[in-house]
């Protein structure tokens, strides 16, 4: 079992700025790992921008900004709660994997009861934000939370736990509902945009999981990276191309034009193609996978939102 003596306190980054007693809780929430926040918050940003671009009526900018802030805070809380919950359930596995054995719970810096309380608090904070949104959002939020709670059990019973992470794609219909648009009024475009988000999430997580694939196999943790170790590249590229085509369909089916095609679809294509080319093969086991995914996700999201914002401005 790892001990506190094996652990080196952070000397830089956001964790180094915290009081020493709170650092383990910051680690538990992964506040030093922005990739997860990008992946959980950016779909809501895209959802708000997409809804603004396709809405039959012009939505006021102040209304859009207000919903964007609430949904971003929701994404922050749910991601934080999900990390703490995941570590609580995975404590036995994390002790046996070199990359995770010094996390707060395995090394004894946070008690299981403390982690459970922190998880409940963060879920509670997220739930309180729903009071500021239309009641329909509670349905989408319940789906997101259910699958967030289910995720850590997936690797024990399935070779495809990454598919559970597609719950993040519910950000698209939730964003639409928050802006008083019924996602079922546009079922095919909504499904296409959601599938595009889901494809990106699964693609990045599979590539990221390759770092631990060998050790996960030894300790019995199941994942798509373990199950499809020999064809990871093909699966990742399949998800990339299908996600890009779904994004294209989601825009075309709602009449979006050249700005969407050039900036949104083009930015998505270039950003994530760059990520795959740098991260697959020998690069999949590199510690740089997270930073590559972070920069690619940021690049793709900026261009995707810019294209949708351009479409919104054209319709003003």
Swiss-Prot record:
Question: Which is a GO BP term held by this UniProt record?
Answer: terpenoid biosynthetic process
> Per the annotation, which location comes first and is thus the protein's main one?
membrane
Cofactors (names): Mg(2+)
Show the catalytic activity. Answer: 3,5-dimethylorsellinate + (2E,6E)-farnesyl diphosphate = (3R)-3-farnesyl-6-hydroxy-2,3,5-trimethyl-4-oxocyclohexa-1,5-diene-1-carboxylate + diphosphate + H(+)
Q: Which GO terms describe its molecular function?
A: 4-hydroxybenzoate polyprenyltransferase activity
Transmembrane residue ranges: 45-65, 69-89, 108-128, 129-149, 163-183, 188-208, 233-253, 256-276, 296-316
The entry sums up its family as follows:
Belongs to the UbiA prenyltransferase family.
Keyword Cytoplasm: yes or no? no
| Function, in words | Polyprenyl transferase; part of the gene cluster A that mediates the biosynthesis of the fungal meroterpenoid acetoxydehydroaustin. The first step of the pathway is the synthesis of 3,5-dimethylorsellinic acid by the polyketide synthase ausA. 3,5-dimethylorsellinic acid is then prenylated by the polyprenyl transferase ausN. Further epoxidation by the FAD-dependent monooxygenase ausM and cyclization by the probable terpene cyclase ausL lead to the formation of protoaustinoid A.
Against PANTHER family, the record matches this protein to:
POLYPRENYL TRANSFERASE AUSN, PRENYLTRANSFERASES
How does the UniProt record describe the way this protein sits in the membrane? Multi-pass membrane protein
Q: In which pathway does it act?
A: Secondary metabolite biosynthesis; terpenoid biosynthesis
Q: Does the keyword Hydrolase apply?
A: no
EC number(s): the record gives 2.5.1.-
Subcellular localization is given as:
Membrane
**What does the entry list under GO cellular component?**
mitochondrial inner membrane
Q: What else is known?
A: In A.calidoustus, the austinoid gene cluster lies on a contiguous DNA region, while clusters from E.nidulans and P.brasilianum are split in their respective genomes. Genetic rearrangements provoked variability among the clusters and E.nidulans produces the least number of austionoid derivatives with the end products austinol and dehydroaustinol, while P.brasilianum can produce until acetoxydehydroaustin, and A.calidoustus produces the highest number of identified derivatives.
Going by the entry's taxonomy, the superkingdom of the source organism is recorded as: Eukaryota
Q: Gene3D superfamilies from the xrefs?
A: UbiA prenyltransferase (1.20.120.1780)
* Protein encoded by which gene: ausN
Keywords attached to this entry: Magnesium, Membrane, Transferase, Transmembrane, Transmembrane helix
State the protein's name: Polyprenyl transferase ausN
**InterPro entries for the chain:** Prenyltransferase (IPR039653), UbiA_prenyltransferase (IPR000537), UbiA_prenylTrfase_CS (IPR030470), UbiA_sf (IPR044878)
């Amino acid at each position: 079992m790892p001990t506190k003596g094996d652990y080196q306190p952070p000397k830089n980054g956001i964790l180094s700025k915290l009081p020493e007693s709170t650092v383990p809780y910051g680690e538990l929430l992964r506040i030093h790992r922005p990739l997860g926040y990008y992946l959980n918050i950016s779909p809501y940003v895209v959802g708000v921008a997409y809804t603004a671009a396709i809405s039959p009526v012009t939505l006021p900018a102040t209304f859009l900004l207000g919903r964007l802030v609430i949904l971003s805070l929701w994404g922050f809380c749910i991601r934080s709660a999900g990390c703490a919950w995941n570590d609580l359930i995975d404590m036995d596995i994390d002790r046996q994997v070199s990359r995770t054995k010094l996390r707060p719970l395995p090394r004894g810096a946070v008690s299981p009861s403390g982690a459970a309380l922190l998880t409940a608090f963060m879920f509670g904070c997220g739930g309180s934000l729903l009071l500021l949104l239309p009641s329909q959002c509670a349905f989408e939020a319940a789906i997101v939370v259910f699958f967030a709670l289910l995720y850590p059990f997936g690797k024990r019973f399935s070779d495809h736990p990454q598919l559970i992470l597609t719950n993040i794609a519910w950000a698209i219909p939730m964003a639409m509902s928050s802006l008083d648009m019924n996602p079922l009024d546009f079922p095919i475009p909504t499904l296409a945009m959601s599938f595009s988000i889901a494809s990106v999430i699964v693609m990045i997580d599979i590539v990221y999981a390759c770092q631990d694939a060998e050790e996960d196999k030894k300790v019995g943790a199941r994942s798509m990276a373990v199950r499809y170790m020999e064809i990871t590249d093909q699966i990742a590229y399949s998800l990339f191309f299908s996600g890009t085509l779904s994004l294209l369909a989601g825009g075309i089916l709602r009449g979006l034009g050249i700005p969407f095609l050039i900036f949104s679809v083009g930015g998505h294509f270039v950003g994530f193609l760059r990520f795959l080319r740098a991260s697959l093969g020998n690069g999949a086991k590199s510690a740089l996978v997270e930073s590559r995914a972070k920069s690619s996700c940021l690049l793709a999201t900026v261009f995707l939102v810019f294209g949708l914002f351009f479409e919104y401005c054209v319709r003003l």
